[in-house]
């Protein structure tokens, strides 16, 4: 764009110079014809035109010089660089090794742990695989939490009591024979928990007993033919027939025959 504008300005200057030439030729012709008043006016106008053209050219050259002095590319914004901690690789490796040594020392110091709820001492065996895991981790290990009692019978203990109980060793009471210090430690130490969990036997629900109702036996007595043939008004005769014995029935049958 800047080259195009300069080219247009150069063309306009050429045209102005040509017009001034034609104007000068015209003035010379008028001077030959003894027209002094017209010549004076024309010379004054020519002087004004030349002065204006000189001013315009001076402005153009100054603007072109400033454009060449300035870079055409866009101004680059300098980013504010944040202060970085330029540490040497030896220093970082030294810090890395020191952190691993501190981690290993803390793990070795936490080997003899005592469980307050069960009172058993145990030691963590460190293998090569554990050492590799410790080296790979850069953060410190989390503090060991006490195991949760599944039965929930024991109340929750304070954190200070837990730390104090870890520092004191467990001494069995069987080894103390008349030693007061040993007996005091034996009393303070936690009780030994059973090796096996108690087996819970499920209770059998008793089945409800079904009581049978007693069966009533009905005795059917034979009625005689007379009792059947008697009219309904006579109520005493059928009762006698019902209450009569089987021998009486046989006698009646023989008499009828």
Curated annotation (Swiss-Prot):
Disulfide bonds join 173-186, 176-182. The keyword Transmembrane helix applies. Residues 70-166, 193-257 are annotated as: Disordered. Pfam families: Glycoprotein_G. Residues 73-90, 98-123, 150-166, 231-243 have a biased composition (Polar residues). Glycans are attached at residues 72, 80, 85, 87, 92, 105, 139, 163, 199, 215, 233, 251, 253. The keyword Lipoprotein does not apply. The chain crosses the membrane at residues 38-66. Residues 187-198 are annotated as: Binding to host heparan sulfate. Keywords: Disulfide bond, Glycoprotein, Host cell membrane, Host membrane, Host-virus interaction, Membrane, Secreted, Transmembrane, Transmembrane helix, Viral attachment to host cell, Viral immunoevasion, Virion, Virus entry into host cell. Residues 67-257 are extracellular. InterPro entries: G_prot (IPR000925). The record marks 65-66 as: Cleavage. GO terms for biological process: symbiont entry into host cell; virion attachment to host cell. Residues 1-37 are cytoplasmic. One of its GO terms (cellular component) is host cell plasma membrane. Belongs to the pneumoviruses glycoprotein G family. This is Major surface glycoprotein G.
